[in-house]
């Protein structure tokens, strides 16, 4: 039998056996809707909030600042679209780089059809963005800088603390896609001046179809999905308890 060597963990990881064991009871035993008031629903709600607390603690956030999503792509869509529609038309300018994940670049291209102005910054031969280029690109119409933390193709780890400091000084929101870097490099939303952070599970030996968006308390953002009012009325839809 040929032995398989897997080198594509940057794309997705195998679900860890311990994770599978932890998930199983929530398919067949504690299968309730976390919004239900009966015993099984309350237990599902308890584990939902326990998971939210663990994620929040891992990035030094408050528990109420974590919104669960269906993955990193949805979280990126939520961050960019939600902020655009809550700031437009007073502000319509976003700064990003040319080497972002497709779920940033294609959202930016779509937002351009809705009235957004996007600056796509170049990077150097190692994939780093120049802080001065960000600074020079900020205008009175800029409301967001979105730059990936750890690049999904070449592995460059941006200096998000320096970028966050600049954005805070300029009163511009800063979003980073940390799907590739989460659990691999430290994320401290306060120290690094992060306003929104995208996370997901399937890059860290968890299941596909689940992610999260950190949204700093006080930020005004247009809801991503309307319905039953789940996730602080920002992302309606019954939560994926086994995945979360």
Task: Tell what function each PLM region has.
Residues 1-244:
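Pyridoxal 5′-phosphate
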